[in-house]
Amino acid sequence: MSTLSDSVVPNVVVIDPRFESYKQLADSARLGRINLHIRSSGAEAIKLARRRTVDAWLIAADLDDMSGHDLVELLRSRAAEAKVAMVEANTPGSRLHAVAEQEAGAVGADAVLAHPITLRDLEELLGLPAEERTKVFAASGFAKAFVTLPVGVGAAAVSIAILLLG
């Protein structure tokens, strides 16, 4: 659990110009399971790293302004405690994926992930299994049912509470 920031919900930053590839992670963010930030360039990611504690970085190999490998090296020099994964298009188990894993390891990445990236992938990257996350939420006073409510239902409950309070 020492890999997570002070917030219970992990802060995850995706740096990839192809935003549409992260639908499953966006769904997890809407459920309150992760705080998801998406950027398309390395410069934007570095600015964010100055302002926010990040638990996991997911970095595509090709960015708008630099290579993903260069960004991994820059982030490692600034935020060594955060987990960093390279996102590759190659199928896990393929020869190209094995080469990508070697290259990513050489620049300091903790893992190589392939699409679709799921909440389970992030839990493995952070070293925090789902059962332990449930315990962390319960210990923090969050009801399990509250954490899994869709945003629409949560927003409706807040609206009703505001109307009742005046």
Please describe what each predicted stretch is:
Residues 113-126:
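C-terminal output helix
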Residues 54, 68, 99-112:
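As written
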